[in-house]
Design a protein with these regions (language model features):
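N-terminal signal peptide c-region/cleavage motif recognized by signal peptidases
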Residues: 17-21
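OB-fold and OB-like single-stranded nucleic-acid-recognition modules
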Residues: 22-173
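Bacterial N-terminal signal peptides that target proteins for export
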Residues: 1-9
Length: 173
């Protein structure tokens, strides 16, 4: 009986711990801004086609300045298992042509076609599996442990880091 109990107890503890370990908190971009901090400015949109030539010329120039490179972050999110939707801005690729290091941003074109959003609206992520380059024009869910940690890249400053354990297409429910 004692031998059976000594085997059963660790198994029971493991089963009870699984729901806690597997719990993933779904975040929205507003959750990355601390209460009382200023909201991010709206993204710059190019709706006037008469400005298209100027915009294309600006693409060839130096990168636009980031809106707030040291924006305040939410410390309580450190080491929380999360999932966050967004767009991928590639930083590094594998030999197989998959993006393995990237910035996750809230809207398409951020850091590339328009100035980068504040640092608390950018997550610097790495992934062993990566994402195919041809899939980068659509939004994704990124899932993994979020760290409140500053990261610099050639495109922007990020207020958060993540080891992206799961990457999958964003679909409306």
């Amino acid at each position: 009986m004692r031998n059976t109990m000594s085997r059963l107890l660790p198994a029971l503890l493991l089963v009870l711990a699984l729901p806690v370990a597997a719990e993933v908190r779904e975040l929205q971009w507003s959750d990355l801004i601390p209460p009382g901090a200023p909201p991010p400015p709206p993204p710059v949109a190019l709706h006037d086609l008469s400005q298209l030539a100027d915009a294309l010329e600006a693409e060839a120039g130096p990168a636009a300045m980031q809106q707030s490179p040291a924006a305040p972050v939410v410390e309580a999110l450190d080491d929380v298992q999360v999932k966050l939707p967004g767009y991928i801005v590639p930083l590094d690729m594998s030999e197989e042509g998959r993006v393995t290091e990237f910035l996750l941003v809230p809207y398409f074109g951020a850091c590339i076609h328009v100035p980068p959003p504040p640092s608390n609206q950018i997550v610097h992520a790495t992934s062993e599996l990566g994402v195919k380059v041809e899939q980068l024009y659509q939004p994704f869910w990124i899932e993994g442990p979020l760290r409140v940690e500053h990261a610099s890249s050639e495109l922007a400053e990020a207020g958060y880091r993540m080891d992206a354990q799961k990457i999958y297409f964003y679909e409306l429910d």
